[in-house]
């Protein structure tokens, strides 16, 4: 009787729910990560990014640009501002303008890092296919190149391809459909055609070539070192949904904190440097005459300026309307917004100093070239 009673008291074995021949528990991690990504993207895209982009498109050309580095004003200047007043206000307004995009970048960067720790990416060797993957995900994301840095950082920390991270970072601020429409609506078509010819060269020719040279210089990695060393798959199908969510949340929080510690100080430093530089440049005097030294000197600076998405178009359109010479208009359009001190710092510290310098030099040379080529288009 005791044996019979003991057998009757045993809990019934759980009958697995199968999806494509696997227990549904095997998909809990994917479900948690996917649900979180959808929630974040929906909140960012529909609550902030696209309403903001549509507003910028609607107001293009209808008001004066207050700054070349920020779009939203938190701190107003006094009646007779000093140089320090202008710098402090620029720093505060830059941080305020970037607050949502940077927060999104940090959140998504940590998510990519977590995803690739659970499911290490297959490191395919096709540079063009990997670049295309970055473009396809980057173009609709609608983040400025600065806000894309934490995402690119999460991708590379997750041991994915550097070309995918770079193409995501460079395509997001330039290939968004709202930004493209703003360029062709606010400027003569020659500017837009030249701009996107150069972006095509960057993404489809120069970027794969530079990454190819970078990869050749790297030591050959074993398969074990090419992916995250932590293996989670052995217990993937054993945990409940709640336990899986806790596991994902703990690892995600750890990755987010590491990303905040490395990225936020760089963001604050970029705000200070860009504010000091822009408040010190005698732009009116520079715009008065077109010279190679002026164009080259400006290119060295504007390539590094961290600006919100679409501000490059807004600035270029205002310069054009105010009669600034075409080389300067094209220079600002082609150099602002695609690269900056933030992606350069990320590449310098996380990837390769030579790669960072090479990309910086590439954007400077392309900006100078565009400034002179536009004169052929115009005339």
Give the predicted meaning of each segment:
Residues 1-38, 54-81, 216-255:
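Intrinsically disordered, low-complexity non-transmembrane regions of multi-pass membrane transporters
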Residues 36-56, 123-124, 130, 184, ...:
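Juxtamembrane and boundary regions of transmembrane helices in multi-pass small-molecule transporters
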Residues 84-88, 129-133, 242-253, 297:
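Alpha-helical membrane-protein architecture signal
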Residues 81-104, 109:
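Individual transmembrane alpha-helix segments
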Residues 105, 111-123, 249-324:
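Transmembrane helical segments that form the transport core of multi-pass membrane transport proteins
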Residues 134-198, 280-355, 360:
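Membrane-interfacial helix-loop connectors
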């Amino acid at each position: 009787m005791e044996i019979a009673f003991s057998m009757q008291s045993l809990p019934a074995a759980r009958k697995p729910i199968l999806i494509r021949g696997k227990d549904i528990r095997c998909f809990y991690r994917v479900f948690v990560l996917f649900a979180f990504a959808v929630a974040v993207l929906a909140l960012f895209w529909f609550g902030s990014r696209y309403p903001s982009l549509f507003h910028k498109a609607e107001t293009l050309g209808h008001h004066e640009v207050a700054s070349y580095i920020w779009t939203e004003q938190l701190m107003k200047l006094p009646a007779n501002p000093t140089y320090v007043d202008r710098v402090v206000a620029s720093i505060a307004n830059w941080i305020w303008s970037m607050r949502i995009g940077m927060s999104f970048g940090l959140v998504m960067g940590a998510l990519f890092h977590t995803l690739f720790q659970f499911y290490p990416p297959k490191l395919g060797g096709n540079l063009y296919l990997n670049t295309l993957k970055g473009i396809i995900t980057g173009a609709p994301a609608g983040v400025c190149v600065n806000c894309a840095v934490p995402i690119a950082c999460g991708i590379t920390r997750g041991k994915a391809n550097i070309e995918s991270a770079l193409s995501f970072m460079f395509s997001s601020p330039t290939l968004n459909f709202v930004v493209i429409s703003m360029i062709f609506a606010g400027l003569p078509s020659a500017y837009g055609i030249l701009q996107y010819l150069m972006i095509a060269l960057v993404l489809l020719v120069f970027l794969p070539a530079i990454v190819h040279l970078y990869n050749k210089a790297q030591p050959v990695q074993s398969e074990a070192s090419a992916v995250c060393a932590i293996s989670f798959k052995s217990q993937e199908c054993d945990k409940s949904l709640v336990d899986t969510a806790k596991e994902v949340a703990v690892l995600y929080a750890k990755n987010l904190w590491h990303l905040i510690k490395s990225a936020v100080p760089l963001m604050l430093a970029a705000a200070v440097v860009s504010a000091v530089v822009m408040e010190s440049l005698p732009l009116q005097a520079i715009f008065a005459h077109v010279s190679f030294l002026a164009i080259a000197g400006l290119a060295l600076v504007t390539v590094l300026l961290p600006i919100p998405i679409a501000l490059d178009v807004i600035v270029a359109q205002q310069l054009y309307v105010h009669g600034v010479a075409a080389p300067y208009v094209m220079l600002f359009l082609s150099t602002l917004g695609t690269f900056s001190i933030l992606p350069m710092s990320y590449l310098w510290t996380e990837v390769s100093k030579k790669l960072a310098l090479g990309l910086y030099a590439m954007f400077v040379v392309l900006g100078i070239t565009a400034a002179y080529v536009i004169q052929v288009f115009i005339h």
